[in-house]
Amino acid sequence: MTAETRILELRAELDQHNYRYYVLDEPSVPDAEYDRLFNELKALEAEHPHLVTPDSPTQRVGGAALAAFSQVRHEVPMLSLGNAFEEADLREFGRRVVEGLDQPGAVDYSCEPKLDGLAVSLLYRDGQLVQGATRGDGTTGEDISANVRTVRNIPLKLQGKGWPAVLEVRGEVYMSKAGFDRLNAAQAEAGGKTFANPRNAAAGSLRQLDSKITASRPLEFCCYGVGQVSESIGDSHIGILEQLKAWGLPISRELKHAAGIEECLAYYRDIGERRNSLPYEIDGVVFKVNSLAAQRELGFRAREPRWAIAHKFPAMEELTEVLDVEFQVGRTGAVTPVARLKPVKVAGVTVSNATLHNMDEIARLGLRIGDTVIIRRAGDVIPQVMQVVLERRPQGARPVEVPSACPVCGSQVERTRLVKRSKGKETTSEGAVYRCVGRLACGAQLKQAIIHYVSRRAMDIDGLGEKSVEQLVDEGLIGSPADLYKLQFEQVVGLEGFAEVSTQKLLDAIEASKRPSLARFIYALGIPDVGEETAKVLARSLGSLARVQQALPQVLTYLPDIGLEVAYEIHNFFEDEHNQKVIQQLLDSGMQLQDEGELAAEFAASTTLAGMIAKLDIASVGPTGAEKLVARLDSLDKIIAADGIDLRQALAAKQADAVREFFKDEANQKLARDIEAQLLAFGMHWSSEKKVAEGLPLAGQTWVLTGTLERMSRDIAKDKLESLGAKVAGSVSGKTHCVVAGPGAGSKLAKAAELGVKVLDEDAFVTFLAEQGIAV
């Protein structure tokens, strides 16, 4: 059998498995067998790239990022539907339909859940998917073709035969509840942005300019109709959907037929009762006159059809009473209010607590203890207080007061005004945060700090979950993260959950954590607004804990993706005497940071005097003006000392005056000199006499990990490579420097062989790390 024949066989088999899994909901093979076939196809296509076609099941990984989406005009407008909020609204719709058709007997309707996602159009030509577009304003949408190709249950090629030359399919891209939970958990673990609800997650994922991001998101598609079609494919709405299903397009498993409005109402009530158990979010039900001839007879009004309506569910809201407002203390000491409610069922779940976020939210709501409020389960998950019902306020309703002492440790609670910073300016906002000043003497802060410190993405101390940490704190065995390294066997054994074996495993894990990467250590410190990726940026760019501790806020903004707000959080954290003491205690406990070294060479070389000037808050002087200024005056001293004549030879009069005015202020002179001094001390340069700091050994190299590593996890291997300056990618390309391949390596290994990329097995990789001074 030739490779081409086998590739065609595999594609056909995988397409059939996809159809049975996504459309019929009847998986025909175990996941492991599907993966084996898929990997075989990927490997064959890697060996024979000229045989790769756009409709191959392997072509869903996403391509190069776009600068912007292009516009797509809908040949048949994507109209919105009218809404019914009450049963009376639906009955009135039914009356209008009967009147418009003037026919005896009950009108036939199709019934489908209204998925809460993003409406899209898919265009197939001769059975091949050629375009995907958003609804937009109904007339013009955005071309998201690269992104829709990554959605697993959208067929790249239609099944069967008999499809028209041109077929535009319309439907909803959505995210299941389970997929949404997995995505948010992964985002939170990586220190990334989490989403408020599945709809936002689906919309944000589908509108990514980088389709590789879309490919990583658990999106699904459900077809609900057609747009332009070159020939008729049915005479009823349900008939068309069943035909689309036969061609491989997923339709709702809840699609039903109803005879008359009363059966529609019965469907609505049934779906409403089962709403919480459905695997996806819905916000109502859509009813359509089933006959296409009847649809044509009824026609349209304004921008909506007369033959369809969306019967919306009521918002997931209920009334209840605020019994009290209590205050919780978080890891950073923030004291936040929580409403204790008279228990009430909202969307089938009993709610007795609701978040109030902060005192600003309480002020916005005008909330008092004793008030009747509207509670909503936002996204059907997080109970929130939406509104106070003022007409029900009792005479004895009490204002909410922030405690002057911490409810956990009794320390003072301080109010701090929120500050917004932009370059050199500080703006005090109306908001404020309340914090317990007890630090690690506060049990709540200590427990949360330790839980964060030992977490998998931080110091990765296995065996210390939340309950274990709470127990160690409550027993008085740990009062700071450094106390973990003082724990003795006799102190731990016998505590709940700790027998002799588990105690020794815990102590071994604690000891092993003394050799973290710099990035892990920084992340474990729990600096406000510093997630895992920001910690990696700090470690990779600055190269040592000392530089991170010393860095001025303005210098930190030179690092990728660090703005002034986060820069001040980092700087203030390391300036704090209490935090300095905690860090020193950790270092004194035997901590050995594994990858400290020089400043990143590309970072040092990329910093210029013009770049520094552009970052100062000089009115009307941006990057271009700064370049002109430095071309004329090539040192900070010359710029500060320059008179109006010198400055006007480089800049327009307005800009020159702004520079002179800025540097008249001695505080601005000092700030600029301090920034320059630190940049030069760190190894950055803009003088030919300054030597560029040597880079890390793998700086500028891209590595790929594949297969199962037996002597370390993939995460640890990635950390070690990044500590040497490498970028770790998820796929092999011509730019890949080296592939580390463990047992079970598949298509990535084949791709590396095809491209002639260097490959190391695990033993060779461990030897390489040892040569770089990194132990495993």
Swiss-Prot record:
The active site is at K114 (n6-amp-lysine intermediate). InterPro entries: BRCT_dom (IPR001357), BRCT_dom_sf (IPR036420), DisA/LigA_HHH (IPR041663), DNA_ligase (IPR001679), DNA_ligase_AS (IPR018239), DNA_ligase_CS (IPR033136), DNAligase_adenylation (IPR013839), DNAligase_N (IPR013840). Transmembrane segments: none annotated. One of its GO terms (biological process) is DNA replication. Zn(2+) binds at C406, C409, C436, C442. This is DNA ligase. NAD(+) binds at D31, A32, E33, Y34, D35, S80, L81, E112, R135, E172, K288, K312. Its EC number is 6.5.1.2. It is an enzyme of class 6 (ligase). Keywords: DNA damage, DNA repair, DNA replication, Ligase, Magnesium, Manganese, Metal-binding, NAD, Zinc.
